[in-house]
Amino acid sequence: MSRHEDRQKLALEFGATDNVTERGEEGAARIKELTGGLGAHSVVEAVGTQESMMQAIRSTRAGGHVGFVGVLHDVEIPGREFFYSHVHLHGGPAPVRRFLPELIDLIWNRKIDPGKVFDLTLPLEQVAEGYRAMDERRAIKTLLRP
């Protein structure tokens, strides 16, 4: 799900079958439409806002899973709606160190190319500009060089 063309292209390159640009109720309805009325088996929520979390839950089929990573920003999940959604919710900080050895191995053996997400390269002393570019959606991810 993205409204940004560069992210949409990258998602398709990584194997996405569809791009959904709608948000909120419209976004959840579009996911249901694409899945024959059922909803997604699994949803990753990586934004951390009220709207994005509720859209994730509402886009997931009964018995499906929502995984969230990162810090939630004042998200309140209505108990009754969540209970009757029959959705499993899992989350917490991303355990980077757990996966890092395997990921490094995949990178070194050229089985994955993480460079595709880096569309802006800056010197380390411009780290603030890198974060600003990502926040303003001028960059997907910023690669900082010493």
Name each region found by the language model.
Residues 1-4, 72, 95:
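Residues in the short beta-alpha loop(s) of Rossmann-like NAD(P)-binding domains
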Residues 1-55:
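Adenosine-nucleotide cofactor-binding segment
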Residues 20, 41-46, 69-71, 92, ...:
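Glycine- and other small-residue-rich loops at beta-strand/loop junctions that grip anionic moieties
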Residues 42, 64-65, 88:
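Short glycine-centered segments of the SAM/dcSAM-binding site in methyltransferase folds
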Residues 54-58, 97-146:
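C-terminal hydrophobic helical "lid"/dimerization subdomain
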Residues 60-62:
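Helix-to-beta-strand junctions that scaffold the AdoMet/dcAdoMet cofactor pocket
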Residues 70-86, 98-105:
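Rossmann-fold NAD(P)-binding glycine/threonine-rich loop
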